[in-house]
Amino acid sequence: GRAEDLWPEHQGFDVNIAGTKNGHPAAGYFSPYKNSRLTDGPKGEYLTQRLTDEAISLVDEYSKQTAPFFMMLSFYTVHTPLAAPEKDVQKYHAKMRKLPHDKVFQKEEQVWPIADKREVRVKQNHPTYAAMVNQMDTQVGRLLAKLQSRR
């Protein structure tokens, strides 16, 4: 329908991997993805890693050419449904257990003036969210390392 007209390949991009009308991974972050724009990987493959693998393959392909190229990589992370590899989630469960008691609050850092200063919990109970951010950071690092190796 109309939404498909707005997909990247109809807006000047040569390649669109995994981009659909959904702003989130409809079937979750682990293969099978049930995404018409991305073939399923091995069962249990993590989407953030897969998108990085695809981006690295494109860097390899396009860097053989002399013309510059533009790549836009948008991870679905950290959108719901929250999910990450279990070893990463366990890492942040362990870190969370080492933090002070759950009732400890502190003033939220303000980067601009705000009328209502709020307090936030020191101990956040979001190990899966933290694991997703960690995975995204790791994958951005992989892609940057690939780009650096191509200089």
Where do the language-model regions lie?
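Active-site-proximal cap/lid insertion segments
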Residues: A3-P8, V15-R151
